[in-house]
Amino acid sequence: MRKMMPDIDLIISGHTHTQLDEPIQHGDTYIVSCGEYGRNLGTISMTQKDDGRWDVDTYELIPVTDEIKADAATQERIDKLMGTVDTNYLSHFGYTKDQILAENDIEFSSVDDMYNEHEELNLGDIMSDAYVYAVENSEYYDGDPVDVAVVPSGTVRDTYTKGDVTVEQVYNSFSLGIGKDGLAGYPLISAYLTGKELKLVAEIDASVSDFMTIARLYCSGLNFTYNPHRMILNKVTDCYLMKAQGEGNREEIEDDKLYHVVTDLYTGQMLGAVMDTSYGLLSITPKDKDGNPIENLEDQAIMEGNQELKAWAAIARYMESFDDTDGDGIANVSEYYNEKHDRKVVEDSWNIIDLVKHPNKFSAIIAGIFVLVIVLIILLILLVRRIVRKIKNN
């Protein structure tokens, strides 16, 4: 941006999740950023120079903590607005913001974990399982079982702490977006992918998400193993279907078969960006149940009558569906989420056999390019030597 518009004096970065403890100076332009999730406020003081440009005098990030006393007038306004949340929004879904959905004793992974740890995480497990539960237990369920549900890290905004899980907390955990209905929250969408494309979903997580961490994928129904040391786009060594929570046996994926996939609208729209990142090598086309490509993903929103099934509402329903194990009339989050279930297994091996087993077409393409480059280098060396000999002989 600075290169395109050098006359800008100050760029306040947003949506990058980057905390800059000191401004970045690029020519006469300063770039600042407070970080993410409202954890800091930033203050900056600048003095104008004789040439019209500006110098930074002071710059400080101020952590937002409970120790900061709220402004009374502002807090009063916020409280009045919060009172409308129940009547103007949550009433559409039969909830109130302070309603307790479940009691939680599980230590769930954090949002930061989703970006920093490339493995199965229980926060992703419970969210993806919630998608399956909400669809298959809706009064509008059409009887078509969900084979796979997918949740990317890029949509998750908060975790679930120990104690009471309220509607407000669940909404905050998945608060992004808006649907075609004009109501806040991304809806769930229903689509179909071939078995070959399901394997590519696993490969996107294994190969692409280290460069594009919003594409870390957490699946219900799709289990896979990957080796981070293998060639890019050929890191997945095993991929198969398994019912949520391990019910039933392993099911091998048929490349040409259509599988029912549920995800949120954001994820569907994100596929284009992922394919661009892979330069078209990873191509996934969402389809209807007859195998026809879907032109508008918004039209695939899962509807309950005239209302979209929102992703956050799916999670809320799942939370309150758990058994009441302590008899106090409130659901308890299942102990199932206290451990991993081989949904995403990391095979951290440098063994030569592990590095080359199960090659796919991408490894063949990349290997072919590598060999071609080596051949061209050899030919270039031979050509240079030949030219040098001719020069010496002359």
What are these regions (language model features)?
Residues 30-34:
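Short hydrophobic/aromatic-enriched beta-strand-loop microsegments
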Residues 1, 21, 249:
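Short, flexible, glycine/charge-rich loop motifs used to bind or transfer phosphoryl groups or to couple energy/partner
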Residues 35-394:
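Catalytic centers of hydrolytic enzymes
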Residues 1-13, 118-119:
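Active-site-proximal segments of metal-dependent phosphoesterases and phosphodiesterases across multiple
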Residues 6-9, 27-29, 144-146, 257-259:
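Loop/turn elements at helix/coil->beta-strand transitions in domains of secreted/extracellular proteins
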Residues 10-25, 38-42, 157-158:
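Active-site environment of divalent metal-dependent phosphoester hydrolases
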Residues 1-6, 24-28, 49:
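Short, surface-exposed basic-aromatic patches at helix termini and helix-loop junctions that form
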